[in-house]
């Protein structure tokens, strides 16, 4: 394999842009910390950190495969490996399968409940990229896909799925819809021209308001989570910090400028991080 081909595969997996991996990792860590009520099992932690990297990479590959015929018409994505011809569709499918199989082999070291849940995770990762052709709610499907690691991680750590798992699942799904709508605002004009659907298009001039409402609901549910577990001040400080970051994001997107909407999207990494730190300290 040539250096150029390896570089193309690396870019296809978005290894040069880790934001998606981080946004998937933080809620996974939330689940592990809460399920363990502190420090999770090291084997489980290692499996899920590696699994997040592999599955996010697999998701990027299948996403670019699904979008290979439209990415060439979008300024931001024209130079991706598939539309630029540096990777073929067949090579992308093979890479997706290799990443998916590698992830499943990791899951096989977990308990039966986690293994059973993994099948739904694979389905969600596969179907999400195609949803933008059929519905204005692909961000909802991303929310489901990016939240599925939560019940899996919880099951791996505690071997059970109490109802609060799905509450945390809902928190993350709402947050994901909010930040992926910010991301969709970057490409909205191009998406309208080529017929791709998104919540940014669906929400229209109400986009900032709806993002704000989703963020507010996320914060309210986080406070309830803290009350349920009787968490200390460190967690509420982290929720307050997340709220401040949401306010900053609203400031960034106020004029709907592409670059600033993208910066708002990237800023969500800090939201996930401060909440993970708050949970860790609270359960310590």
From Swiss-Prot:
Reaction catalysed by this enzyme: all-trans-octaprenyl diphosphate + 4-hydroxybenzoate = 4-hydroxy-3-(all-trans-octaprenyl)benzoate + diphosphate
GO molecular function, one term: 4-hydroxybenzoate polyprenyltransferase activity
GO cellular component terms attached to this protein's record: plasma membrane
Class of the enzyme per the UniProt entry, highest EC level: transferase
Protein function: Catalyzes the prenylation of para-hydroxybenzoate (PHB) with an all-trans polyprenyl group. Mediates the second step in the final reaction sequence of ubiquinone-8 (UQ-8) biosynthesis, which is the condensation of the polyisoprenoid side chain with PHB, generating the first membrane-bound Q intermediate 3-octaprenyl-4-hydroxybenzoate.
Record-listed E.C. numbers: 2.5.1.39
Record-annotated membrane-spanning stretches: 18-38, 42-62, 93-113, 136-156, 161-181, 209-229, 233-253, 264-284
Protein's name in the database: 4-hydroxybenzoate octaprenyltransferase
Organism superkingdom: Bacteria
Keywords: Cell inner membrane, Cell membrane, Magnesium, Membrane, Transferase, Transmembrane, Transmembrane helix, Ubiquinone biosynthesis
PANTHER family from the UniProt entry: 4-HYDROXYBENZOATE POLYPRENYLTRANSFERASE, MITOCHONDRIAL, PRENYLTRANSFERASES
Cited Pfam families: UbiA (PF01040)
Membrane topology recorded in Swiss-Prot or TrEMBL: Multi-pass membrane protein
NCBIfam families: ubiA_proteo (TIGR01474)
Pathway(s) per entry: Cofactor biosynthesis; ubiquinone biosynthesis
Similarity section: Belongs to the UbiA prenyltransferase family.
Subcellular location: Cell inner membrane
């Amino acid at each position: 394999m040539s250096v150029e081909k390896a570089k193309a595969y690396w870019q296809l997996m978005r290894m040069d842009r880790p934001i998606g991996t981080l946004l998937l990792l933080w809620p996974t860590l939330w689940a592990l910390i809460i399920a363990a009520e502190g420090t999770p099992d090291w084997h489980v932690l290692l499996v899920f950190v590696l699994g997040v990297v592999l599955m996010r990479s697999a998701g990027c590959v299948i996403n670019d495969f699904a979008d290979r015929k439209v990415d060439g018409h979008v300024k931001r994505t024209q130079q991706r490996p598939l539309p630029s011809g540096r990777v073929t569709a067949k090579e992308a499918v093979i890479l997706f399968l290799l990443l998916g199989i590698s992830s499943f082999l990791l899951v096989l070291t977990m308990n039966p409940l986690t293994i059973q849940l993994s099948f739904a995770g694979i389905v969600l990762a596969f179907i999400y990229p195609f949803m933008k052709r059929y519905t204005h709610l692909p961000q909802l499907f991303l929310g489901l896909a990016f939240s599925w690691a939560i019940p899996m991680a919880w099951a791996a750590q505690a071997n059970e799925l109490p109802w609060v798992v799905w509450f945390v699942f809902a928190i993350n799904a709402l947050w994901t819809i909010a930040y992926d709508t910010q991301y969709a605002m970057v490409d909205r004009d191009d998406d309208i021209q080529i017929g791709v659907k998104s919540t940014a298009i669906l929400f229209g001039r109400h986009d900032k308001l709806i993002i704000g409402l989703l963020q507010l609901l996320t914060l309210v549910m986080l406070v309830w989570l803290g009350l349920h577990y009787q968490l200390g001040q460190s967690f509420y400080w982290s929720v307050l910090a997340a709220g401040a970051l949401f306010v900053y994001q609203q400031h960034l997107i106020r004029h709907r400028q592409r670059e600033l909407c993208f910066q708002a999207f990237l800023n969500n990494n800090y939201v996930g991080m401060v909440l993970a730190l708050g949970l860790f300290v609270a359960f310590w």
